[in-house]
């Protein structure tokens, strides 16, 4: 069962999403300690501005200590101002790319914000753009010219040669703090846990959609594919350290706005092909129970597969995870166990996950330890450094990550997200592509 404070937090988010006039009844009677926990939850899930917008003028908030109210208001307002600035800078940069002949498909971020009643209260730390591989050199040169810095070593699949195009590259501007992730693939092809998902998006440039943001038209994924991408993105983060409630809000808002444009037969077919029907049904059940979502009101169509939702365990994990499953060191380190289980379906996922964490593939090590990329003969030293760091964590930290990982593997099984012997290869039915009706 979720706690009284968590129930109140979800009620506040529901009020924000649905623009309720009255303050949520669930916040009445909260103690100062519970209010503190509610604000911590809001910050962990990157929703403090939204929470303040709902509760800031309530009598319950007015009764809290001055210092607490000041801190919450200051952090919320700073977040809004930063988001307003980042949005303006992004729209300018996106327009410049268009002038250079590049048509990026903008995903999540600014597109999801535009679905909210008050977009700037839904912050995003970066903007994600999907581009054609042939446009990468143009985009890279543009950002370098504008003073951006590449955030990390080029993300290359194994076997890549010099001059090949990266699958992902981050760019951060040292003065403004603006951060972009440029993708030529939506998911790492090196990941056997979710790399196969790329097949579902192999023809998205053939049928993009346009959205208006502050009077500027930008290209994005077509609505059905965008909703499925949000689901896949949540799945990916769930396999790592966990997915946050904001990602569920994004899905709910996408359906609220575009429910009657989404091809539901196609969407649920994609879910079936990629083995995500159970996961999606339970995510939307959370939306129905706590976030004011309605299939009927939004024009959404339920899955043909009759599964009885049982989303409480999933919700508890989501609330504990924070925005991207980074609420604790134990949860972050546990990702190796869940990823190993998702990749192999092996029963010995704990031992295998720990081993994979200590001895990952060489390409990962070269990204994580730049000296190993510069001087390949030092790769063994990087492995030793990694193992010694894990051994130095102490028994308590090691035990925590193992317990969290084992518990989350049980969730993968419960929501049908882990390989079993009778699984066929996901997405093979149509080579991962479902042709849209012309």
Put a short name on every predicted segment:
Residues 1-125, 131-438:
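Conserved NTP-donor binding/palm subdomain of two-metal-ion nucleotidyltransferases/polymerases, i.e.
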């Amino acid at each position: 069962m979720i706690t009284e404070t968590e129930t109140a937090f979800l009620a506040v988010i529901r009020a924000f999403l649905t623009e309720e006039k009255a303050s949520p009844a669930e916040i009445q009677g909260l103690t100062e300690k519970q209010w503190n926990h509610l604000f911590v939850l809001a910050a962990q899930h990157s929703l403090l501005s939204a929470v303040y917008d709902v509760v800031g003028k309530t009598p319950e908030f007015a009764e809290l200590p001055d210092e607490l109210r000041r801190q919450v208001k200051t952090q919320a307002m700073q977040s809004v101002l930063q988001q307003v600035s980042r949005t303006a800078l992004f729209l300018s940069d996106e327009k410049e790319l268009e002038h250079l002949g590049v048509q990026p498909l903008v995903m999540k971020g600014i597109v999801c914000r535009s679905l909210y009643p008050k977009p700037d209260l839904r912050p995003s730390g970066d903007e994600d753009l999907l581009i054609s591989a042939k446009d990468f050199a143009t985009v890279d040169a543009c950002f370098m010219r504008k003073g951006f810095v590449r955030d990390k070593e080029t993300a290359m699949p194994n076997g890549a040669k010099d001059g090949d195009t990266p699958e992902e590259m981050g760019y951060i501007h040292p003065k403004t703090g603006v951060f972009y992730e440029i993708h030529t693939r939506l998911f790492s092809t090196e990941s056997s846990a979710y790399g196969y998902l790329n097949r579902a998006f192999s023809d998205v440039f053939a049928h993009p959609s346009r959205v208006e943001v502050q009077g500027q038209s930008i290209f994005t994924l077509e609505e059905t594919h965008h909703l499925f991408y949000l689901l896949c993105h949540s799945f990916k983060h769930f396999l790592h350290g966990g997915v946050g409630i904001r990602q569920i809000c994004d899905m709910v808002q996408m359906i609220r706005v575009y429910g009657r444009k989404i091809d539901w037969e196609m969407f649920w077919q994609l879910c079936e092909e990629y083995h995500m029907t159970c996961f999606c049904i339970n995510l939307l059940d959370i939306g129905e129970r706590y976030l004011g979502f309605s299939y009927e009101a939004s024009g959404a169509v339920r899955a043909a597969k009759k599964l009885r939702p049982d989303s409480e365990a999933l919700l508890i994990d989501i609330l504990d995870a924070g925005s991207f499953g980074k609420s604790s060191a134990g949860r972050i380190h546990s990702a190796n166990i869940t990823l190993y289980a998702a990749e192999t379906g092996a029963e010995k996922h704990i031992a295998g996950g720990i081993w994979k964490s200590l001895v990952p593939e060489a390409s990962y090590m070269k990204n994580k330890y730049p000296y190993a990329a510069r001087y390949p003969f030092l790769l063994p030293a990087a492995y030793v450094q990694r193992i010694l760091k894990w051994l130095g964590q102490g028994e308590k930290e090691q035990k925590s990550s193992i317990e969290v990982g084992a518990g989350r593997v049980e969730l993968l099984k419960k929501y049908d997200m882990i390989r079993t012997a009778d699984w066929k290869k996901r997405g093979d039915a149509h080579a991962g592509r479902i042709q849209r009706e012309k």
